[in-house]
Every structure is written in structure tokens, then in C-alpha cells.
């Protein structure tokens, strides 16, 4: 049942109030506070009940209803938002006891996947991006721009895109929520299908996507008349996207945005683009096995000490640098930290004491922080002078720059320390979090309440003596205030001037004029104290937010120090070397190792290191050899070493010289994309086409088993043709692993193609995979041996060996390579059958055949193909 299914006259006043609010927030799940519960109604109730697995009930007029206790709301809301829902919270904003008529309710918070500050929803080591993509008509062409923000850190970026690259950008960014225009339905649907699982998709009105609207809101946010100083003036579509984001934040009641102090262009020339396939195939951030961090490059490299560094490290690994000078500057800083172990350990200790400045600032600026968070921010800021002093004596260019750029805020630290009690807890309800001596009026109110409470103890003693009731007590609760409690056993001793307030099973409660007088003094002082304390705390938060730009700059520098130190720890503990970075298109890795596999091997099993050499004479390494011999690991290893080097990290190798790579493309493994109706082979061909269309001479191509998803002939032809195209048209450094041994012929036909193989050691009827990549081609795939190792029944293995021996004896399914050339590949299989088939077809008299005769003849030909005999 929807809200429209019931006449408005049938609704209660509260339900009419609910419907009025729901009309203003139709796209949100509305959580409506009713007493101690948040309730949902109509279709919202069905959604909530299903999403949270809670009971769906009904009100008196059959209205569906589902709810949960308000004290447990954070966990329930987190579950809803993680499932992609947008939630509006409608609270009671007046005391039901004093309300005249229906209790007044208002929207107090809006939470969406891209706009949340909740620790129950966020991962402190992962950014939470809200993104907008805009397609804008400029003259005769359509331009595309994107903007994305993490409201929990204040990071706000803008990017210019080619329209056809928007989907790739989204898959790479992996935002929590995407904003698009209702006017561009076709492109919006394309983007929806490109979104990673779990990303919320929000369609907004067309009028929000106007340049004038965006310009006004950006100028207002950054208090400027021109955006030229931000370097984004030449990206109109990106500006519109940024304006849409800011409007959406205002719409979702994010009114305190002063901590968002800058917007930064994401320059494509600064960073390497890693598409989703490359991230997945190289397992940079998550493993292919279960999607978790376990088994990924990030798990090995992340030795950061605080959340800011952890988030930045994820960005570094997903955005390797493209300029040799920038890479070398980062490597030099890592080198210095690696060599200075005692200094590095001291720095890491300091980093461990620094809380998440970025997210704390966002919560403080939006008045969502609790006193303990403010105190932690002050403690973190107090470490900055120590870090600045520590780095004064460093020599590498980047570390010196960091030392100069760190900006201590001693006055702000002193203010926080003087204002917030170090014992402040998580709750603000009972006050007491502002320190004594910070504000005179607050101290006076507290003193008044304290003095009055002391007088209550005196009243208690006086009444005990006056009534001779030794158990008489003066107590307090939130419902009845202060009262005198007397047990039933002493009921006959109660004086007549005692005014009864409440009767219990075993006691009665009273008040007297003196108690009323001091109760009023205490409650009045405490109420005023709580209000004043809250005002002082909010004022302190606003003062802190006024330093947002400096705090964010310090946070960025601390995160960078954390990442550099983490790199240095990896280099020191894992035995990594400092790569030499150059602008040429060569690549020289000596005794390289896979950074993840070497960490998970048993301690007594050494990792087999391998070289990777590219120069003018070696542009394409054709790698043959059996499955399980290490070909795929070798490809991934090479890609990860290049990626680490350009991310500014030392690499797992004895020596490495990296000619800067502009893109790393991978085609390693494939599976069906059932959602898009794509087969394994089509997925493979789509990925291969993307590589051929976008790779350059400065790219690194990692191609594994191209063509295996189709017939032998088709697959070999495609693989051969791709090799030729890469050699002639692209000239990229290429590792080409294949089970088509015929491709080894290319070494003699295409200059720069060089054969390598994954070596094995044969011992009787067994083989040992050595995991060593050596010069030369392989002539055996050892497929039966791999099948034996997998645990296949011995009868199957024995029969397979017999079949293979027979096929090799008759030269069946073994292509001849002598006819392969650049002009044609004339591979002849089943020569005898082909000849007989051709003869049988030639003698058929088609003109005299009836349809039935044709079917009979076709059956005979089919028998020849299947069995080698005419049926």
C-alpha cells in the first residue's frame, strides 16, 4: 500500500504530519520519531522490513509499518545506507508533555551513501566519494566533466573527461554515490550500468546542471569572483559537476561547509590511469578471490600508522606518477627514511599518536563532534611542532619541503586544552565537558548548583533529626525532581506539612517548601549551565573550523610522511631496492619478485626470482610453457614492480631501471559477464580491443593466453594478428604469455620479438615446474601432468596419455609451422580427412538431389568429419 491508497480524511493528525514531510522527501526512506521508536510507513516500511529483516506490522487502518528503537538507530541506519538507501531522519523537536496538539517534528538529519559522517558506515582507511558527472554541449561538440568530494575529509576534485571515458573513470574512482541529470537519460543509464556494485545512483532535476547556477554556488562557497586561481576555469562541465555536488550537500542539510576550502583539478598528465581490469588483474587494492584486502598489494605495502596515511596510500597505488622528476623526489625521501632507522621509528611513534585530523575536522565543522574528538584533535595538533623539528635536519628535497610547510597552531592547541576537559566522555547530555576556569559565568552557575546540593544534604540531616526517621533520604529523578523518600514502616512519623508526590509499594515520596526552593535553584542553574556549555562548545568548534585550511594542509603533509615512512619500512624489512627512473622506453628488472606471493610462501621455500629486460632489441617477450609453471605470476610481478616504482616505492628486485610507463594494460584471465550478456570470449575480446585502441609506445602490455576462449584456429589467428599489430602499430613493451607454441615462429619474423619459456625439469614420467623464466621457446605444455597434479583419477590420466601418443604418431592436432608467414598462416590439420571430404563434396550432383537425398548425404559427410569414415 502506498500513501496514495488511503484518503487523507482517514488519516490521524500524526499520519497527516508524516505524509506532509514525506511529500518533501519522496526519494528518501523517512524515519519518523514516535516516542522511543523510529517508524516507517507504507512502501518505506516494506523496504525497511526487507532490508533490515525486521517485522512488518500494520496500523489500525491497514497501513504497513516497521520500526526500531531510537537508541539503536545508528546501527540500523548504517545497514540501510550500506545497501544504497538514502535516509531522512524526522525527530520530535518539542517535549510531548508540553506540546499543544500534535508534537512538532522536523528533519534533523539526512544520510546518503555519499553524504555521511557516521563511523558505523565509514571505513577510516577508505575514502567515501560523492561524484557528479556532467555532459555539456559546447558549440558543436559535447564535453564531459566530473567532480568528486569526500565530505568526511574535505577533499574536493574536478576532472575533465572524454565522454567515452566516463564509465572507465567511474569504475576506477568507485564512488559511494553518483549524481546525474534527469535530462540525459541514455547516458545516465550507461553510467548506471558502469557503476560498481553498491554505488547509489541519484537523478537530479535538469535545472541544477546549468553553468550559471554552478558558477554562483562555487563563487559563494569559495568566496571568490573568479575560479581561475583554482585552475579549473577551462573545464566548464567539471565546474557544473562541482556546483551540482555543492547544491546536493545544501539540499541534504550539510549547512556548515566552511571546511571545504579548495577544489583541485585532477590533471591526467600527472598520474597514470589504471582501468578496472588492471586493478583487478594485478590485485592492487583487493584480491580476486574474495574481494577483500587479503592477498592484495595494498595489504603488503600498507604499513601506515594513521587513517590519513592509509587513505593516501590507496590513492598513491591507484594513481602512479608519470613524471620522472616527481617519482625520483619521492624515492629519495623514502631512501633517506630507510637509511635512518632510529629516526624513522621515532617519526612512526609520533604518527601513531595523531588521530584522524581530516575526519575530526569535518565532524567539528559540521557540529557533529563530541568533546572527546575535539580534545583528540588538539592532542594531534600538539605533535606537529615535534614533527617539524624532527625534519629540520633531513636532506632530501621532499622531506625538507615538508618540514618547511608544516604549520603549528599553538594558540589553537592551547585554547582546546583550556576549554575541553581531558576526561570528557562520549555523551554531552549531562554536561561537564568544558573545563573549570574557561568561562566565568559557567563556573558561577556550577558553583550555584553545587552550593545548593550541599544545602540539600543539610536539609536531609535536619529532617532526619526533626522526624526521628534515620532512613529518610533526599533523592532525585528526572520525572519528579528532588523529593524526600520515607519507607512505609515510618509512615506514621511523617509530619503534616510534608506534601505527598508519589506512592510506591514500600515507600512514599514527599516534598517540603525548603526542598522546593533549592530544587528550583539547582535545576535552574543546571539547565542554564547545560545550555551555556553547549553554546561554548559550538563556538569552540566554529573557532577550530576557522583554521580549516591550515589543519587540512597539515593533515595532508602528515599523511604524506606516513606513506613515505611506510614505504621505507617495506624497503627495509622486505629487502626492496631503489629503482632508477628514466624517460626512455626500456625496462630492466634483475631478480624481480612478486611482492605478494613472496610474503605468503612458507619460510623454508624461497621465491624464484626472474629478470625482465626490454630494450631496442627486446620489445615483446613471447613466453611459452606449461600451465602452473609461473607465466601469469611473472606477468603480474612485472606489472606490480613497475607500478610500485612509479608510485614512489622501492621494488622487490635486486636491481631495477624503469623507463616511465604511461599505462599498464592487462589481459589476464576472463570470466562471463552474465549481467551484460557477454561470454568469456567476448569479455576477453573487449579487453583486448581496449588495449589495442589505447596503448602507446610508452605503455606496458601484459597479455596472458589471448585467444583461448574460442577454437584453436580462431584463437591462434587472433593471437598472431595481435602480436603483429602491437609490433607494427604500437611498439609497446609487451609480455605475451601463450599456450600457442606456434607463436614462437614470430621471433624469426618480427624484430624485437624474443622467445622465453617457463622452464621445467623432467624426471622419468614426472615433471617439476622450476618457476624460472629462461631464454628460448617451449615445445610442450605438460597438460596431462597438470591434470595429474590436480587429482584426476589415474584411469583418466592413463587414457589421456594413450590418446596423446596416438595423436602425436599420426601428427593429428599438431600444426605445421613451416607454412607460417607474415602474408598468411596456412595451418593444415587432419590432412587426410580434409582431402577425402573435399573429394566427397566434389562428386555430389546437387542439381539431381531431392531434399531427402541432401540430408542423407549431409549425414555421411558428418560421419566422415566425426569418425574419419563415410557412414
UniProtKB/Swiss-Prot annotation:
- GO terms of molecular function: ATP binding; ATP-dependent DNA damage sensor activity; damaged DNA binding; mismatched DNA binding
* HAMAP family to which the protein is assigned, alphabetical: MutS
What is the protein's name according to its record?
DNA mismatch repair protein MutS
Traced from the root, the source organism's taxonomic lineage reads: Bacteria, Pseudomonadati, Chlorobiota, Chlorobiia, Chlorobiales
Entry keyword annotation includes Heme: no
The record's function comment reads:
This protein is involved in the repair of mismatches in DNA. It is possible that it carries out the mismatch recognition step. This protein has a weak ATPase activity.
Binding site residues for ATP: 625-632
Alphabetical list of PROSITE patterns matching this protein: DNA_MISMATCH_REPAIR_2
Organism domain of life: Bacteria
Classification via Gene3D superfamilies: 1.10.1420.10, DNA repair protein MutS, domain I, MutS, connector domain, P-loop containing nucleotide triphosphate hydrolases
Q: Which family does it belong to?
A: Belongs to the DNA mismatch repair MutS family.
Question: In its keyword annotation, does this UniProt entry include Flavoprotein?
Answer: no
Record-linked InterPro entries: DNA_mismatch_repair_MutS (IPR005748), DNA_mismatch_repair_MutS-lik_N (IPR007695), DNA_mismatch_repair_MutS/MSH (IPR017261), DNA_mismatch_repair_MutS_C (IPR000432), DNA_mismatch_repair_MutS_clamp (IPR007861), DNA_mismatch_repair_MutS_core (IPR007696), DNA_mismatch_repair_MutS_N (IPR016151), DNA_mismatch_repair_MutS_sf (IPR036187)
**Record GO cellular component, one term:** cytosol
Q: Which NCBIfam families match?
A: mutS1, PRK05399.1
Among the Pfam families in the record, one is MutS_V
Q: What's any GO biological process attached to this entry?
A: mismatch repair
UniProtKB keywords: ATP-binding, DNA damage, DNA repair, DNA-binding, Nucleotide-binding
Q: Which SUPFAM superfamilies match?
A: DNA repair protein MutS, domain I, DNA repair protein MutS, domain II, DNA repair protein MutS, domain III, P-loop containing nucleoside triphosphate hydrolases
Amino acid at each position: 500500500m502506498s500513501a496514495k491508497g488511503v484518503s487523507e480524511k482517514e488519516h490521524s493528525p500524526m499520519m497527516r504530519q508524516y505524509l506532509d514531510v514525506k511529500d518533501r522527501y519522496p526519494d528518501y526512506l523517512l524515519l519518523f520519531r514516535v516516542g522511543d521508536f523510529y517508524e516507517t510507513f507504507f512502501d518505506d516500511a516494506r523496504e525497511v522490513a526487507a532490508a533490515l529483516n525486521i517485522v512488518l506490522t500494520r496500523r489500525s487502518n491497514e497501513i504497513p509499518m516497521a520500526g526500531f528503537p531510537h537508541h539503536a538507530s545508528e546501527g540500523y541506519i548504517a545497514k540501510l545506507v550500506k545497501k544504497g538507501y538514502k535516509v531522512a531522519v524526522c525527530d520530535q523537536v518539542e517535549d510531548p508533555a508540553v506540546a499543544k496538539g500534535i508534537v512538532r517534528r522536523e528533519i534533523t538529519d539526512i544520510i546518503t551513501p555519499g553524504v555521511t559522517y557516521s563511523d558505523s558506515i565509514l571505513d577510516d582507511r577508505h575514502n567515501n566519494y560523492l561524484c557528479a558527472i556532467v555532459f555539456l554541449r559546447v558549440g558543436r561538440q559535447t564535453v564531459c566533466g566530473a567532480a568528486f568530494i569526500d565530505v568526511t575529509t574535505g577533499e574536493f576534485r574536478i576532472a575533465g573527461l572524454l565522454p567515452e571515458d566516463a564509465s572507465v573513470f567511474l569504475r576506477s574512482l568507485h564512488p559511494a554515490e553518483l549524481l546525474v541529470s534527469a535530462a540525459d537519460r541514455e547516458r545516465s543509464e550507461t553510467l548506471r550500468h558502469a557503476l560498481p556494485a553498491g554505488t547509489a545512483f541519484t537523478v537530479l532535476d535538469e535545472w541544477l546542471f546549468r553553468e550559471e547556477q554552478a558558477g554562483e554556488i562555487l563563487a559563494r562557497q569559495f568566496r571568490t569572483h573568479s575560479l581561475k586561481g583554482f585552475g579549473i576555469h577551462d573545464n566548464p562541465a567539471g565546474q557544473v559537476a562541482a556546483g551540482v555536488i555543492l547544491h546536493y550537500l545544501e539540499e541534504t542539510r550539510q549547512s556548515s561547509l566552511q571546511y571545504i576550502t579548495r577544489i583541485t583539478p585532477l590533471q591526467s598528465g600527472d598520474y597514470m590511469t589504471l582501468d578496472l581490469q588492471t586493478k583487478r588483474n594485478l590485485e592492487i587494492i583487493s584480491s580476486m578471490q574474495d574481494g577483500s584486502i587479503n592477498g592484495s598489494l595494498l595489504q603488503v605495502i600498507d604499513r601506515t600508522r594513521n587513517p590519513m596515511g592509509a587513505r593516501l596510500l590507496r590513492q598513491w597505488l591507484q594513481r602512479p606518477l608519470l613524471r620522472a622528476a616527481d617519482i625520483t623526489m619521492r624515492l629519495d625521501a623514502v631512501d633517506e627514511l630507510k637509511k635512518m632507522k632510529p629516526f624513522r621509528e621515532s617519526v612512526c611513534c609520533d604518527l601513531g599518536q595523531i588521530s584522524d585530523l581530516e575526519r575530526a575536522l569535518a565532524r567539528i565543522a559540521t557540529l557533529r563532534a563530541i568533546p572527546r574528538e575535539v580534545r583528540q584533535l588538539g592532542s594531534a595538533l600538539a605533535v606537529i611542532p615535534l614533527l617539524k623539528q624532527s625534519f629540520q635536519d633531513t636532506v632530501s628535497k621532499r622531506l625538507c619541503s615538508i618540514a618547511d610547510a608544516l604549520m603549528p597552531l599553538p594558540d589553537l592547541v592551547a585554547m582546546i586544552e583550556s576549554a575541553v576537559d581531558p576526561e570528557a566522555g562520549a555523551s554531552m547530555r549531562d554536561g561537564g565537558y568544558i573545563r573549570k576556569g574557561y568561562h566565568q559565568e559557567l563556573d558561577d552557575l556550577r558553583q550555584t548548583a553545587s552550593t545548593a546540593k550541599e544545602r540539600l544534604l543539610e536539609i536531609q540531616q535536619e529532617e532526619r533529626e526533626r522526624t526521628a526517621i534515620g532512613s529518610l533520604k533526599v533523592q532525585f529523578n528526572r520525572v519528579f525532581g528532588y523529593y524526600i523518600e520515607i519507607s512505609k514502616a515510618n509512615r506514621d512519623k511523617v509530619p503534616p506539612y510534608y506534601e505527598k508526590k508519589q506512592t510506591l509499594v514500600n515507600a512514599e515520596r514527599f516534598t517540603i517548601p525548603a526542598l522546593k526552593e533549592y530544587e528550583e535553584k539547582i535545576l535552574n542553574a543546571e539547565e542554564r549551565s547545560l545550555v551555556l556549555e553547549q553554546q561554548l562548545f559550538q563556538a569552540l568548534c566554529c573557532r577550530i573550523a576557522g583554521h580549516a585550511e591550515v589543519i587540512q594542509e597539515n593533515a595532508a603533509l602528515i599523511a604524506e610522511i606516513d606513506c613515505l615512512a611506510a614505504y621505507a619500512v617495506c624497503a627495509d624489512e622486505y629487502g626492496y631496492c631503489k629503482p632508477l627512473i628514466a624517460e626512455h622506453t626500456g625496462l630492466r628488472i634483475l631478480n624481480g619478485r612478486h611482492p605478494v606471493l613472496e610474503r605468503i610462501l612458507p619460510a623454508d621455500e624461497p621465491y624464484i626470482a626472474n629478470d625482465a629486460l626490454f630494450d631496442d632489441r627486446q620489445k615483446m617477450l613471447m613466453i611459452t610453457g606449461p600451465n602452473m609453471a609461473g607465466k601469469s605470476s611473472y606477468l603480474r610481478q612485472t606489472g606490480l614492480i613497475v607500478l610500485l616504482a612509479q608510485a614512489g616505492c622501492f621494488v622487490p628486485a635486486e636491481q631495477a631501471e624503469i623507463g616511465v610507463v604511461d599505462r599498464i594494460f592487462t589481459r589476464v584471465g576472463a570470466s562471463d559477464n552474465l549481467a551484460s550478456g557477454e561470454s568469456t570470449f567476448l569479455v576477453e575480446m573487449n579487453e583486448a580491443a581496449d588495449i589495442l585502441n589505447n596503448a602507446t609506445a610508452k605503455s606496458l602490455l601484459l597479455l596472458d593466453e589471448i585467444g583461448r576462449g574460442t577454437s584453436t584456429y580462431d584463437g591462434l589467428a587472433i593471437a598472431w594478428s595481435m602480436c603483429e599489430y602491437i609490433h607494427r602499430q604500437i611498439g609497446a613493451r609487451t609480455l605475451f604469455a601463450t599456450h600457442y607454441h606456434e607463436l614462437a615462429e614470430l621471433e624469426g619474423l618480427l624484430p624485437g620479438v624474443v622467445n622465453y619459456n617457463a622452464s621445467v625439469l623432467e624426471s622419468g614420467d614426472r615433471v617439476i615446474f622450476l618457476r624460472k623464466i629462461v631464454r628460448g621457446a617451449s615445445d610442450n605444455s605438460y597438460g596431462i601432468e597438470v591434470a595429474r597434479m590436480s587429482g584426476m583419477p589415474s584411469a583418466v590420466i592413463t587414457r589421456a596419455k594413450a590418446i596423446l601418443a596416438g595423436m602425436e604418431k599420426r601428427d593429428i592436432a599438431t600444426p605445421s609451422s613451416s607454412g607460417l608467414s607474415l602474408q598468411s598462416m596456412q595451418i593444415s590439420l587432419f590432412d587426410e580427412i580434409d582431402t577425402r571430404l573435399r573429394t566427397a563434396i566434389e562428386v555430389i550432383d546437387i542439381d539431381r538431389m531431392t531434399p531427402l537425398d541432401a540430408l542423407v548425404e549431409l549425414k555421411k559427410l558428418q560421419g566422415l568429419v566425426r569418425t574419419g569414415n563415410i557412414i
